[in-house]
């Protein structure tokens, strides 16, 4: 019975410590995805007037 309480405490402590290191990796991944999204948005912003003009002609 005592071992299970200690085991649960150790598992919770490890999860708390590991969650801090995971946040850095996830933050970096999120920034990369955000940058890619911005590039796609800017490219679409440039291409949409051209596409609208071609569609109006055709």
From Swiss-Prot:
Q: Where in the cell is it found?
A: Secreted
Fetch the Pfam families from UniProt. Cecropin
| Signal peptide (UniProt feature, chain positions) | 1-23
**Effect noted on mutating residue 2 to H:** In strain: GAM4B and GAM6B
Instruction: Give the primary localization class.
Output: secreted
Q: GO cellular-component terms in the record?
A: extracellular space
- UniProt entry keywords in alphabetical sequence: Amidation, Antibiotic, Antimicrobial, Fungicide, Immunity, Innate immunity, Secreted, Signal
Tissue specificity annotation: Relatively abundant in head, thorax and to a lesser extent in abdominal carcass and anterior midgut.
Q: How is this protein induced?
A: By bacterial infection.
Q: Where on the chain is Leucine amide found, per UniProt? A: 57
Q: Which GO terms describe its biological process?
A: antibacterial humoral response; defense response to fungus; defense response to Gram-negative bacterium; defense response to Gram-positive bacterium; innate immune response; killing of cells of another organism
Q: Which domain of life is it from?
A: Eukaryota
Substituting residue 20 to H results in: In strain: GAM2B and GAM8B
PANTHER family assigned to the protein according to its UniProt record, in alphabetical order: CECROPIN-A1-RELATED
Purpose of the protein: Antibacterial activity against several Gram-positive and Gram-negative bacteria. Antifungal activity against A.fumigatus, B.cinerea, F.culmorum, F.oxysporum, N.crassa, C.albicans, C.neoformans and S.cerevisiae.
Q: Family assignment?
A: Belongs to the cecropin family.
Protein's name according to its UniProt entry: Cecropin-A
**Species in which this protein is naturally found:** Anopheles gambiae
């Amino acid at each position: 019975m005592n071992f299970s309480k200690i085991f649960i405490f150790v598992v919770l402590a490890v999860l708390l410590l590991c969650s801090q290191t995971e946040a850095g990796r996830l933050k970096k991944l999120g920034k990369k995805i955000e940058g890619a999204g911005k590039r796609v948005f800017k490219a679409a912003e440039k291409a949409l007037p051209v596409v609208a003009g071609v569609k109006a002609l055709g």
